Amino acid sequence: MEPYTLLLFIFVIQIVKQIISAVGKQSIESISWVLYCRVAPKFGHSKLASMSQKSSQLRTVAGERRAVSAQDQYAKWTKLNRQHDKLVAEIEQLQKEVDLDKVKVNTFTGYLIAILTSIPIWFFRVWYRSVVLFYFPPGILPRALEWSIALPFTVTGGVSLTVWMMAAGAVASSLTFLFMFPFEKAVPKPVLAKKSPQQL
């Protein structure tokens, strides 16, 4: 891989990593689950489709049961009540199964986040640890600085991948902060407490 490609690729990964950090892993998991719930029934996910159907039936039965007097139409009310209890039990069982699916979706989302952010960083850090991304002209920087930006495995005068990762991470963090700052909740202005006569 060419050095300039590494430069761009690492910077993009750092941007994605900062965006994920700003949005929050839990928010991404929630979005993933909502998308899964919308898409899965279209591909024959029986649990979600059955749960939606039974929930609709439960609302219908509950409405009919409320409209029937237990004293005047006891047999009909009892039948509706049994249907109601049966549907509630079935929905609870389906909910447990759906909760297990949610755990699987969240686990998959976590793996996907790791694949997109952490794993590439460690791979490049090991595989391209001695690659010089670019050079500074000799004498333009102090000798100690030239030596430090080449750490840990690059020749003096060159910029190592590790240093570029830190620089790209800092820039990505600053850009994310500047973008997210207008959307942050306003901090209330502090009010000075009035001093009592005894404190004066």
From Swiss-Prot:
An example molecular function term from Gene Ontology annotations: protein-membrane adaptor activity
Coiled-coil spans in chain: 75-107
Cellular component annotations (GO), alphabetically ordered: endoplasmic reticulum membrane; GET complex; Golgi membrane
The entry's keywords: Coiled coil, Endoplasmic reticulum, ER-Golgi transport, Golgi apparatus, Membrane, Transmembrane, Transmembrane helix, Transport
Membrane topology, Cytoplasmic segments: 27-113, 176-200
GO biological process: tail-anchored membrane protein insertion into ER membrane; vesicle-mediated transport
Membrane topology: Multi-pass membrane protein
UniProt KW Hydrolase keyword: no
Top-level division of the source organism's lineage: Eukaryota
Pfam family, any one: CHD5
InterPro entries (UniProt xref): Get1, Get1_fungi, Helix_hairpin_bin_sf
Location(s) in or outside the cell: Endoplasmic reticulum membrane; Golgi apparatus membrane
TM region(s), chain numbering: 7-26, 114-134, 159-175
Annotated family: Belongs to the WRB/GET1 family.
HAMAP family the UniProt entry points to: Get1
Function: Required for the post-translational delivery of tail-anchored (TA) proteins to the endoplasmic reticulum. Together with GET2, acts as a membrane receptor for soluble GET3, which recognizes and selectively binds the transmembrane domain of TA proteins in the cytosol. The GET complex cooperates with the HDEL receptor ERD2 to mediate the ATP-dependent retrieval of resident ER proteins that contain a C-terminal H-D-E-L retention signal from the Golgi to the ER.
Subunit note: Component of the Golgi to ER traffic (GET) complex, which is composed of GET1, GET2 and GET3. Within the complex, GET1 and GET2 form a heterotetramer which is stabilized by phosphatidylinositol binding and which binds to the GET3 homodimer.
Protein name: Golgi to ER traffic protein 1
Species: Meyerozyma guilliermondii (strain ATCC 6260 / CBS 566 / DSM 6381 / JCM 1539 / NBRC 10279 / NRRL Y-324) (Yeast)
Species lineage: Eukaryota, Fungi, Dikarya, Ascomycota, Saccharomycotina
